[in-house]
């Protein structure tokens, strides 16, 4: 079968990624190195995207604003704070104070837009992959997670939906009791949803 590229080289320039250390094992991905190197490449691709296809990007942002705005703001804030969890950010941003959040978004608009661009590129590649696999008669099975991560845009943007303490950390955490798999049980650490009558 002919290999298909999903990297959309219209926004990626070879010289921007060919010299990065992605690892040299042909049998296994080195995710540590990929994680460390990807930011520079994605930032360059995002900056080029703004020049090449702004209308498609803007349409994507409008269509997905319900989740994209919070996600991009969260990821930009996380980057600006050196990867620290949101519970360690300054109080105004941690509590999503409207004035402080607006100030951050204005001062870091480039970071926010880059995060939106990365999502746009991902979804464009994902749709290309889905179209290709459908032509090949291959079905992709999705896995819906049952919990969200504590340090996530979901919890940061919607703390009222979770059982959290005053510092934003889980008051109750997900896990399982001891069983045949683990004598000690498992503590996953994911925050539990705050179920109310409106959730049912």
Positions of the model-derived regions?
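Conserved small/polar residues in nucleotide/adenosyl-binding loops
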Residues: 7-15, 195-200
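A structural signal for the main folded, soluble domain(s) of proteins
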Residues: 1-2, 9
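Active-site-proximal, well-structured secondary-structure segments within enzyme catalytic domains
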Residues: 14-194
